Amino acid sequence: MSIEVSNESGMDISEPELISVARFVIARMDVHPAAELSMVLVDSATMADLHVRWMDLPGPTDVMSFPMDELEPGGRPDSPEPGPSMLGDIVLCPSFAADQADKAGHSLAHELALLTVHGVLHLLGYDHAEPEEEKEMFGLQNSLLEEWYEDLRRIDREAALAERDQKLLGKTGFVDGVDR
């Protein structure tokens, strides 16, 4: 899976974290592992321009998604497996997201992770124009975000256990479980 991030926002953003959450969601949604995604982080003026040009709405917004290939999560069990494709582009506006994060009482990193999940779901055809669509998309968005956080916690626990095990093995004279 190829995920490229271009930070043109002028803000210091953790690109590996954005890649991590995007990769997690793409995998959970059964998208072909060779799919490609592009993420661009822009300033408010650039986002406002995109928002007017593509949505005919004034001012900046938090996230916009531009799908490339028609993809659906999962797919029918009797259909041939889809090949790799270009999911599309997600455009994030960190400065706009920072204001939203402040209002919501959480970190910018959390807000950008949430918006990344949101953007990927839009690329996969989810929408929230109608109440039922919104309920489905936001429920899935929140579930995927929580699963990603749980996955990060699991990885941290495993790393801590591995480090502890190495220390214990070192004290006993065993290294990597091999008797010297």
From Swiss-Prot:
UniProt keyword Transmembrane helix present: no
Protein name (database record): Endoribonuclease YbeY
Family under the similarity heading: Belongs to the endoribonuclease YbeY family.
Gene symbol of the encoding locus: ybeY
EC number(s) on file: 3.1.-.-
Cofactor: Zn(2+)
PROSITE patterns for this protein: UPF0054
Binding site for Zn(2+): 118, 122, 128
UniProt entry tagged with the keyword Kinase: no
Function: Single strand-specific metallo-endoribonuclease involved in late-stage 70S ribosome quality control and in maturation of the 3' terminus of the 16S rRNA.
NCBIfam families: rRNA maturation RNase YbeY (TIGR00043)
